[in-house]
UniProtKB/Swiss-Prot annotation:
This is Sensor histidine kinase AtsR. SUPFAM superfamilies: ATPase domain of HSP90 chaperone/DNA topoisomerase II/histidine kinase, CheY-like, Homodimeric domain of signal transducing histidine kinase. Residues 242-461 form the Histidine kinase domain. The gene is atsR. It catalyses: ATP + protein L-histidine = ADP + protein N-phospho-L-histidine. The keyword Chaperone does not apply. The modification 4-aspartylphosphate is found at D533. One of its GO terms (molecular function) is histidine phosphotransfer kinase activity. It is an enzyme of class 2 (transferase). Keywords: Cell inner membrane, Cell membrane, Kinase, Membrane, Phosphoprotein, Transferase, Transmembrane, Transmembrane helix, Two-component regulatory system. The keyword Zinc does not apply.
Length: 602
């Protein structure tokens, strides 16, 4: 069976080669016949018409001669008619002389070139002598003799062109018939070879036809499913992005109101209630942040910074705001950096977000024991890497789920962890950030014992000139009794909350809902601080800020501080940034607002 198959394959190859060679020859003949502009020119002649142009000149020559006879015999004494026919004759001859497809065609023929050159000299004589006949009509007969002497050459030139055209058409038509016959014969041979080839191919692959159809159907179904999946992912990302951004404004009212309450004296019972509200709001804010970050990472190409980063202080900054949750769950947390003064060149914000998400994930799924965060330098001097590890004694992850935990919205469907808050986006964000830094993340986990996430990132060691800034940030004020602020936000809850937060900082606040109202209020009392929403219903926050800047002198001793806020981070990328002193995404926290005001007003 294999010998027959091998013989069939050799026959197929031989017949296929013959058919390809024959088809190439057939295609060349067909292209030579129909596809080239040279053959088309030979068949049709120039598109302007060789004989037609010469015939027009002959007709004009005849009319000029007849008009000149009438003038010479005084049958028509109007000399303008002679000049009119001369102009017509010159125009007709101009078509012969001027560079064109036609002139290029016949000037390549020696006889035609010589005749046209002689007629050109004769036309020059006519242009010189004929205008003088108006005053000396008696010279008309001499000119008529010259015209009559050149008439045979004009007539012969037209007839010559006609003969050339006819001869070329006959020759080309003969070639056309010969090539057509060759094409038909070669096509017949190719058809026979192709038929034999197809029969042999059908005989060889008849058992594979059904399988190929099934495979094609499966590929089509997969492609359609893939297209639908991409469309659904794009629609989902757009929807989730919109939802996450729309949640930021009500979160501003929730978080801000809670922090204002916490800034006031409260009873123990009220404090417990407010703390529960704060924890729930923080959980909701974290979920919205994860969702927004993931959509932003998937929708845009994030630029990665490379600045000196002190790892120990960075990880301490990650751990400090989470110590309250760690303490509430009675966990122990440790931090180790090797070497302790490790400084690398990388993107500080991305590393901080990676570490923060991993630590928060461990806190969620660890009910007792420890959470250990470590960072160490690894690799070789030419290929430095940094490993950040977060190890916990939590519930652990089953092996069959390790490949899924970095998928968006994935949550372990286990009774022991169903109570854990979250939408399954924290690790998906980690994966996207690690990829952005050209690193990778590994997971080791045992159910009931805990998990360890190890992030490996390529880094560089900074030189002496790249040392991080050791200057301590300025101390923040807690009250600003002498300041007067203007809050412009179309959302009433957010506006009232921002006003209450400023009041909690000791700042008097005026509240307005539109850009025009805000400008009117600022015109009545130039404020020290303007908290301005970028998306206002009448005019944009950028326009409001520009008008405020125009209304105040840049040399004034008391310059107005303008703070731009928005639920949409993309809105902060538009407009003129120079008119704002700072941008803050919603929700704004009280300590953040206090820090910004202190820094900008110091």
């Amino acid at each position: 069976m294999s010998r027959v198959k091998w013989r069939n394959e050799k026959i197929i190859v031989a017949l296929g080669s013959l058919w390809i060679l024959g088809f190439a020859a057939w295609a060349f003949l067909l292209f030579d016949l129909l596809g080239t502009s040279v053959k088309e020119g030979i068949l049709e002649g120039p598109r302007e018409g060789v004989f037609w142009t010469a015939a027009q000149y002959r007709n004009s020559f005849s009319r000029f001669e007849r008009q000149l006879i009438l003038y010479a015999t005084r049958q028509d004494r109007d000399f303008d008619n002679v000049l009119l026919q001369l102009d017509s004759l010159e125009a007709s001859f101009g078509f012969l002389e001027r560079p064109s497809e036609v002139s290029a065609y016949w000037l390549s023929i020696p006889k035609a070139r010589d005749d046209i050159a002689e007629l050109s000299r004769f036309m020059a004589t006519l242009r010189r002598d004929v205008p003088a006949l108006g005053a000396r009509a008696g010279d008309s007969r001499r000119v008529l003799e010259d015209v009559a002497r050149h008439w045979p050459k004009v007539n012969a030139l037209a007839n010559y062109f006609r003969a050339i055209e006819m001869e070329q058409r006959d020759f080309t038509f003969h070639q056309l018939k010969e090539k057509r016959r060759a094409i038909v014969m070669l096509g017949g041979v190719l058809g026979v070879i192709l038929g034999a080839l197809f029969l042999l191919l059908f005989y060889t692959i008849r058992t594979r036809g059904s399988l190929l159809e099934q495979q094609q159907a499966a590929l089509d179904a997969q492609r359609k499913a893939s297209d639908r999946a991409f469309e659904m992912i794009a629609a989902k990302n757009a929807f989730l992005g919109m939802v996450s951004h729309e949640l930021r404004t009500p979160l501003q009212a929730i978080c801000g109101s809670i922090e204002v309450l916490l800034a006031r004296p409260q009873s123990d019972a009220n404090m417990k209630t407010i703390k529960r509200l704060q924890n729930s709001a923080a959980s909701l804010e974290a979920q919205v942040k994860d969702l927004t970050d993931y959509i932003k990472l998937r929708s845009t190409n994030r630029s990665v910074q490379s600045d000196p980063v002190e790892i120990a202080p960075l990880l301490a900054d990650v751990l400090d705001p989470l110590r309250g949750r760690i303490r509430d769950k009675h966990l122990n947390a440790s931090l180790r950096v090797e070497p302790p003064d490790l400084v690398v060149k990388s993107d500080r914000k991305l590393i901080q977000q990676i570490a923060s998400n991993l630590v928060e994930n461990s806190i969620k799924y660890t009910n007792s024991g420890t959470i250990a965060i470590s960072a160490e330098l690894a690799g070789t001097p030419s290929n430095r890497t940094m490993q950040i590890a977060v190890r916990d004694t939590g519930v652990g992850i089953a092996k069959n789920l390790l490949s899924k935990i970095f998928e968006p919205f994935f949550r372990v469907n286990d009774p022991g962890v169903r109570h854990v808050d979250g939408i399954g986006m924290g690790l998906a964000v980690v994966q996207e950030l690690v990829v952005a830094l050209r690193g990778h993340v590994d997971v080791r986990s045992v159910v009931g014992e805990g998990s360890e996430f190890v992030v490996t990132l390529p880094v560089e060691l900074p030189g002496s000139a790249d040392a991080p800034d050791d200057d301590a940030p300025p101390s923040l004020q807690t009250t600003h009794r002498d300041l007067h602020a203007l809050v412009v936000d179309d959302n009433e809850n957010a506006r009232e909350t921002l006003g209450a937060m400023l009041t909690a900082l000791g700042i008097r606040a005026d509240l307005r809902g539109t850009g025009k109202e805000g400008l009117r209020c600022f015109g009545e009392c130039q404020h020290d601080i303007v908290v301005l929403d970028l998306e206002l219903p009448d005019i944009s926050g950028f326009e409001v800020a520009e008008q405020i800047r125009w209304a105040t002198s840049p040399d004034a001793a008391k310059k107005t501080t303008i703070l731009g806020v928005s639920a949409y981070e993309s809105a902060m990328l538009k407009g003129d940034h120079a008119v704002f002193d700072a941008f803050v995404p919603k929700p704004i926290h009280l300590d953040t607002l206090n820090g910004i005001v202190s820094r900008l007003r110091s």
